[in-house]
Amino acid sequence: MVDIKKYFLQKSMTRVMVDEFLAKEYYNAEYAGSEISKTPMGTRVTIYAGRPAIIIGKDGKTIKRLAQILEKYFNLENPQITVTQPEKPELNARVMAFRLAVTLEKGYHFRRAAFMTIRRIMNAGALGAEVIVSGKITSERAKFEKLKEGIVYKTGNNLDVMVDRAIAIATLKMGIYGVEVVITKPLRTIDKISLKQTAGTSTGGESGEVRVTNVRIIDETQNVKLEEQLGGAENDQKSQ
């Protein structure tokens, strides 16, 4: 009998190892993530990358070699690989982190490369972006520099739902640079409430949004009890 816990643990470990291998092997292709699913014909592997042509290779040689590696070293049965580009690469933190790392390895100044990254992210419609570059960036002593624009959530539900975070490593002559990219996706926050006018009162069908700052909870049971007391007092007066 197959141990269910061991089975799912092994599947999860394989998925993580494949993801780490692809991130290390194809970071210059702006690797964004992968999905692995079992099919009757074998294993379907979907790879997301900002530059799919690098993973596919000339005449498909690179992707064929990758299929052999996944089958031999990761025990994926008959892997069928599909490489596609994310819907909006500029809103994917992993893509932008690897893109920034490659830019630094090409010799661009870290501050210029970071500003270019933030500008591309914000032009794509993000609510906020933050880039942290650490290492021997200005002297022999390691330090870090943080650049930020817009809204970047640090705690709460918005951090889990709206924020995408990724790290990458750039290897230079001065040493290793650590890169961290944080993106606040253009999603609707929970403190925004849309007010729509009814057909009878609206003039142009306009709608607006308000931001809730203070919320006061009203106990309706107290109002009901108060109405009952007032109603009882009025009945007593009428009877008298």
From Swiss-Prot:
InterPro entries: KH_dom, KH_dom-like_a/b, KH_dom_type_2, KH_sf_prok-type, Ribosomal_S3_C_sf, Ribosomal_uS3_arc, Ribosomal_uS3_C, Ribosomal_uS3_euk/arc. It comes from the Archaea. SMART domains: KH (SM00322). The keyword Nucleus does not apply. One of its GO terms (molecular function) is structural constituent of ribosome. Residues 18-97 form the KH type-2 domain. The keyword Phosphoprotein does not apply. One of its GO terms (cellular component) is cytosolic small ribosomal subunit. One of its GO terms (biological process) is translation. Keywords: Ribonucleoprotein, Ribosomal protein, RNA-binding, rRNA-binding. CDD domains: KH-II_30S_S3_arch. Binds the lower part of the 30S subunit head. Belongs to the universal ribosomal protein uS3 family. Part of the 30S ribosomal subunit. This is Small ribosomal subunit protein uS3. It comes from Metallosphaera sedula (strain ATCC 51363 / DSM 5348 / JCM 9185 / NBRC 15509 / TH2).
